[in-house]
Amino acid sequence: MLGAIIGDIAGSKYEFNNTFDYDFEMFGEGCDFTDDTICTVAIADAILNGRSYQESLLDWCRRYPSPKGAYGGRFAGWIRSLNPQPYNSFGNGSAMRVSPVAWLFDDLSQVLEEAEKTALPTHNHPEGIKGAKAVAHAIWHFRKSRFSEESKECKDKNSKESDDKAMKAFKDIARSYYEDFDTRDYPKGRFDETCMDAVPLSFYLLSQASSFEDAIRLAISHGGDSDTIGAIVGSIAEARFGIPQDMKEKAISYLPDDMKDVLKQFAENAK
């Protein structure tokens, strides 16, 4: 989940002021965590402490009512409501907050079931649910590819062969959710907050990356909804590449103590 947080913080200052410079300042003045981080922490907290996803999302978002970049209009109304109900959203919010599920559950069927549950309080449209499941599936795939005994043996023999095999399987996953993954256009700078755009775009950017930092730089410099694209790409890149220690430490320095506590608990319980 820290990959999502890093992508969110790195992209936060560029969400409404896009950069197309690959060498942008990663953690510069004006960067901060946004709703993407708050909601990701909320999902982790729910799983770790036996809370419902809705209860945890409401708690954390009410605890931090005015994050950098603000909450989306309908989501903000949902937070303030005395009787919050799902509003059939297919926005990218379901995809950006789902990453803890892929680390805290081990069986794919359970990962996908829980991913759907994380979307339902707000993003109960089929595309909102699909976006959450697709991202969780991708993270789970790379987590298993990196840490399985078979993968370790294969990497010892031929690292490139192992990586190529994992990437081929990832692209198959992408196509299983988005049939036109290989043929659609991914123009720079298009601001589209739907799962139908953000998730395949994030998969495409991840497929071009050679390291965690490269993935984040490709995501942010593509423009558009920079913090959320950064969060989705970062969440998958963490599972594929791991995260450099200096980037971990820098991102954590932006977080308040209650979020750090959840991160610590998450690290102790991740599969």
Task: List each model region and its residues.
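Structured, active/binding-site neighborhoods that engage oxygen-rich ligands
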Residues: M1-K271
